[in-house]
């Protein structure tokens, strides 16, 4: 494979490292030697060819959960696959999605709802797929200091005087009612209409008896504020703290480091993490067009191989590598926040009120609990939330949810990548689900803040459990 001339990267783009042609040549010769010696089996090497496209550009938003991309790049995992990648920060989630759809980006760190929404035509219509889930958990809900002062006295206390967690939205309800009595709207920010953050914030509010509003796309209303007690609006993640400080919103749901930034700046208090709303919830995915995966199948598998290795590196040995990862993420071309701010959540702790730092070892999970496997049930949960809040305007059969999940989530590609890594000796069989027995549906999940049970094989029954939200054949 020939060495290519690399263009000078633009500002805020990670510098392209020297391409280790010699390293890859030696690796290939070693592999063939192992093959001849019978150490590895022929099919693993014969089936996966060279990448059809070597030079790639991936997009991301400045959040700590873009870490698998940064680590795959910095640790040479992409290069090991013969891939020469540029990582480019994007202004917001819409710009990122449009970049993937129009081919300016070959793939991207995406909100899990984006490939699903695009495929069913909520917003921009395009068939986007994901063969890789990037992480579990990683978000929080923060309120302004003014709001915190009003809700804190009503929260039960631990023996040491700290607030008892998790803090439900029922404690926010009296504050919202005061705003309403004065004729003022209570406003909160989230990052995108089909973001986990939107659905987690809505879930938390509704569990506490506050209506977060409906969408009515069939009526031309995509505000998401119909019948709302709390008005939710979109703000790009890095702008959340400044928007809160300006008083434009009274709280927000966002990924890190933007909750911890509010703590460090003294402008707000995180009240709950998404781990406390739904333990080990699926968060971001790596998305690309279906057309890309069909045109460049070997490249696609090799991308997933590199990302799997990055996820494993981030979690191995009880997060031993996290401090190094934080140092990388703190660079301006990645997240660009202070080391201490990123470390506050990436290294197993999370700070709520200033000084109230608590152990949450699984606040960010990049590989444990089969975090990287693209489960169909994860896709179904997102689709149920789209239906619950009106983004899917009409009743759909359970079979429809399954069909969409299987169009978008691609465990077949993931399995191919995993089996290659096992054959190469880079990973173990135990690192992955049992592919021969795996249905793609997690067992029913029970650890939600409201005690509800989610069975991905029964989406309509799941929706029937909620007093707030659309269900059955209800329409706006």
Pin down the residues of each PLM region.
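N-terminal secretory signal peptides
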Residues: 1-20, 31-38, 43
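Short glycine- and hydrophobic/aromatic-rich loop-to-beta-strand nucleating segment
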Residues: 141-142, 285-288, 292-293
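Secondary-structure end/capping motifs
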Residues: 294-412
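Sec-dependent signal peptide recognition
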Residues: 24-28
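Conserved C-terminal helix/tail region of periplasmic/extracytoplasmic solute-binding proteins
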Residues: 380-476
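Short, glycine-/small- and polar/acidic-enriched structural segments
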Residues: 47-233, 245-280
